[in-house]
Amino acid sequence: MTEGKRMVDTYKVTHAIHVGDREILFAVDDGKTDCPYMVCDCNWDNPLGIDQFFDPAGSDDYLEMMTEFTNRVQAQLEAVKAERDKITVPLSPFTQEHCTPNNYGESIENKVVVIRTERLRHEYRTVNNQLVLAVGGFGTYANARGRAVYTVNLYSGKEARWNREDILGVLKPEYMPGWAKEQLKQILAGQQAKHKEQVQER
């Protein structure tokens, strides 16, 4: 990608809106008189986390492609709304008062930590996206030089990598929701079973 200019092949990106799990791009190449306007989707679902463009559509009609662009954005908004409607727990995010501060002199391994809301996309700034179990990574250690913190989301069970500075703090036990306690039990039980299998295979 050229400095100050985002490109998709020969097309210059003029509009980009990120909603949910992807970004919708509108790009222009005035040199292609037969198809100067292009719309595509972009995500980063790969080991290197680089731009991955897909589902392109092109035309010489600006209004047609702008309509395609806005339709895709609307479809993503509806998908995120539908996803949120399925959530069965209170959504109000945790703040600093719910946590012990992120003390770099202490280990956070195997502790339930809270992700800072500002590190989450606006549509995901809810408690179900904040609560995670820190399961490993150099960033979990006390006085660590590393930053990586590998986590398991208590609501979805999905694994993710964060940096230590993305963490607001360790959740105070008195604020642990009932649903999170149950999910934590299941996650820990699964980890113990997996560890037992690995030991038996040696």
Regions found by a protein language model. Give the residues of each.
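Short N-terminal "domain-start" leader segments
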Residues: 1-38
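Short aromatic-glycine-(Arg/Gly/Cys) micro-motifs in beta-strand/loop hairpins
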Residues: 27-56
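A short macromolecule-binding patch
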Residues: 47-51, 156-166
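Non-Sec secretion/translocation targeting segments of pathogen effectors
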Residues: 65, 189-202
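Mixed-charge, Lys/Arg-rich low-complexity intrinsically disordered regions
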Residues: 74-122
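Structured surface patches comprising rigid loops and adjacent beta-strands/short helices at the edges
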Residues: 163-176
